[in-house]
A protein has these predicted regions:
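ATP-binding N-terminal substructure of ATP-dependent carboxylate-amine bond-forming enzymes
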Residues: 1-96
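Active-site nucleotide/adenylate-binding loops and adjacent lid/helix of ATP-dependent enzymes
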Residues: 4-5, 90, 103-187, 241-257
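General beta-strand structural signal in soluble alpha/beta enzymes
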Residues: 5, 30-31, 67-68, 93-96, ...
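Short, charged, surface-exposed secondary-structure boundary motifs
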Residues: 38-40, 102-107, 223-224
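Internal nucleotide-binding/catalytic subdomain
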Residues: 158-299
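Active-site "cap" helix and flanking loop/linker of ATP-utilizing ligase/carboxylase catalytic domains
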Residues: 251-274, 291-364
Length: 365
């Protein structure tokens, strides 16, 4: 089969690397891709949200399967675009439809889903510009630190954790009235602060069967010793040392199963990867957020541990035969470290040449 991967990051490079090893993948394309993917596949210079141009290339290259890396095209309805176009109806898309993608596209939607299905998460309330005064009153009744989250997509920057009440009120006003995060902060979710250690859980589902991938933990802060501002992720490890068999069973029983059952009860079709951001509070798991795709940089430590042919698993998703597959992964550890330009995550230079890479490196550099 011919496969198109949509995206341009390290996550998509890892998908490309893994699918290049697949016995069922004939030709591999990435849109728009990057310098790394160009070594393994054909890059197509198309933006991830340019659905019409993507359609043209899918038909021209006789692509059978599309794997969506980032969240933007999913929230914008790329799966629905393929599903509703007679020319593309035969092309399978690994990634949920627009309705399900709201689990990441709207934090309020996700929180309502969790509460409705008894999935453990932080207490919360949602506010709009019209209910700013109620938002102030809600903050006054909370114990600091105060957690403010832009409802929509904000490129991973829409979460503020603030110690001071007056500062929290000021930021709430900025978000709701001044639009400090643009459209994303037209609604703001204020959450109870959860004190614990975070981890990431990954599921692949065809809407009926599902497989649980190795769990991972990413490290977001820019500086040594977990200091400095948050980033998209400076590194990740898998497996996670503090996930015991007992704790893993709690995740499956209290979070994974109720989530998948919730999709069925709410009549939400879900096909693709589901990334559940968790926090371990004491000995209990709670959900911080849902993401409707694989994580970056977590993909870079999860897929190298996977012993299965990824192409076979994704074909099973397309054919809704995932129940027939069993997952197998190496009993080893994987670590990834992210190299970034100076100044990141603020203003930084782009387009610099990366030198000194070993193409035959056993460490996958």
């Amino acid at each position: 089969m011919n496969v198109l991967i949509i995206g341009s990051g390290g996550r998509e490079h890892t998908f490309c690397w893994k699918l290049a090893q697949s016995e069922v993948c004939d030709h591999l394309f990435v849109a728009p891709g990057n310098a790394g993917t160009s070594r393994l596949a054909t890059n197509l210079p198309i933006a991830v949200n340019d659905f019409k141009k993507l359609k043209k290339e899918v038909l021209f290259h006789n692509i059978n399967l599309v794997v969506v890396g980032p969240e933007d095209p999913l929230v914008n309805g790329i799966h629905d675009f393929f599903l509703n176009d007679p020319d593309l109806a035969h092309v399978a898309v690994v990634g949920p439809q627009k309705q399900a993608a709201q689990l990441e596209g709207s934090k309020d939607f996700a929180k309502e889903f969790m509460i409705r299905h008894g999935i453990p998460t932080a207490k919360y309330a949602t506010f709009t510009p019209k209910t700013l005064a109620e938002g102030y009153a809600y903050l006054e009744n909370q114990i600091p630190p105060y957690v403010l989250k832009a409802d929509g997509l904000a490129a991973g920057k829409g979460v503020l954790i603030i110690e001071d009440l007056q500062e929290a009120k000021k930021e709430l006003k900025k978000m709701l009235i001044e639009g400090s995060f643009g459209e994303a902060s037209k609604q703001v979710v204020i959450e109870e602060f959860l004190d614990g250690i975070e981890l990431s859980c990954f599921i692949l589902t065809d809407g009926d069967g599902h497989l649980v991938l190795p769990m991972a933990k990413d490290y977001k802060r820019i500086g040594e010793g977990d200091q400095g501002p948050n980033t998209g992720g400076m590194g990740a490890v898998s497996p996670v040392s503090f996930v015991t068999p007992v704790f893993e069973k709690k995740i499956k029983d209290k979070i994974i199963e109720p989530t998948l059952e919730g999709f069925k009860k709410d009549n939400i079709p879900y096909q693709g990867f589901l990334f559940i951001g968790l926090i371990k509070v004491g000995e209990e798991p709670k959900v911080i957020e849902y993401n409707v795709r694989m994580g970056d940089p977590e993909t870079q430590v999860v897929l190298p541990l996977l012993l299965n042919d990824l192409g076979v698993l994704l074909s099973a998703v397309a054919n809704k035969t995932l129940k027939e597959e069993k997952i197998d992964f190496a009993k080893k550890a994987a670590v990834t470290v992210v190299a970034v330009s100076g100044g990141y995550p603020a203003d930084y230079e782009k387009g610099k040449v990366i030198e000194g890479l070993c193409t035959d490196s056993k460490e996958n550099i």
